[in-house]
Amino acid sequence: MATPLQIGGMVNLEERSGSFLPELPYTNRGVIRQKEELSALIDWCQITIKEVPLEAVIEEVLRIPLELMTVTGYEKGIAGHEVVAIFDNIKVLKPTGNAQYQGFQILMSGKGCRNYENFLQLNEETWFDFLNRVCQYHINFPRIDLAIDDRKPYLSVPDLIIRTKEGLLSSKLREIDFHDSGELKEEVFQSKGGSLYLGSSASNLRLVFYEKGYEQNKKYGTELDENWNRYELRFRQEMAVSVVQELLRYRDVAGLAMEVLNSKIRFLEKPTDSMTTRKRLYPTYQAWAELMKDIGKVKLTMQPQKKSLQKVWEWLEKYVAPSLKL
């Protein structure tokens, strides 16, 4: 079987360190830093695929060379599934116990999505190409997340939390949670990583607003980026399926995000007229209105990780280079 990894054009592997890799503007975490104030990512992709053998899931659906995937002796996975193959954070799981069915589950967390974008780029594909291919099979989408990175930022997450506490939020999502860590400086509380959750963790839609720069600083000790917020739209089950269908039909991430946000929530200003008591008559919070206006410019981007790309090059050198005349 020919390798499913198709490299765009002829790449000289011996020259890669002086040409291809340095051209990608990676940060110290192996992530391409976007210059746009607003950008969108697929940040979680979970797919159930039935009646397809493991080798075909890896080589034909994912289009990852089988030699790159580590086939495990069954490791613990999630929700009644065990990991049977893995490449960094790209996982293929098999159902166990009550979850039995003939097939597998592809699981890519945020890091897994960044890992997989290396293969998309090397195959000269986009997420739309991948999702379209996946939908040719007997599949379901337990979950897919869209993330909007705001590097302006348009919003202050601590301010959103305060507005929510003060009732200045109109929301169709009933369950609300928030976390706001920080410190006192001269008796004034300063946020150091706020998060706002709208919708339950088990619902078909959950919206999460948080300070991504603080999260990355705490997790990895990276340089603090105070101007990096992330707004996540987490879709499950029927809504996840509908989202994928909409993405493939219109290829418009911005329009989809705007439609979901506008239909579910609106942050408010206190009305100047004290007689106004109905929230639907409250004016929209100006910063929220500006975000909704500019979110229409958002495009789906890719931020492949250098770490996993290096593993791909090592595989190419071992398995492909001997058969090429370079």
Predicted regions and their residues:
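Structured, helix-rich domain cores that form ligand/interaction pockets
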Residues: 1-308, 315-326
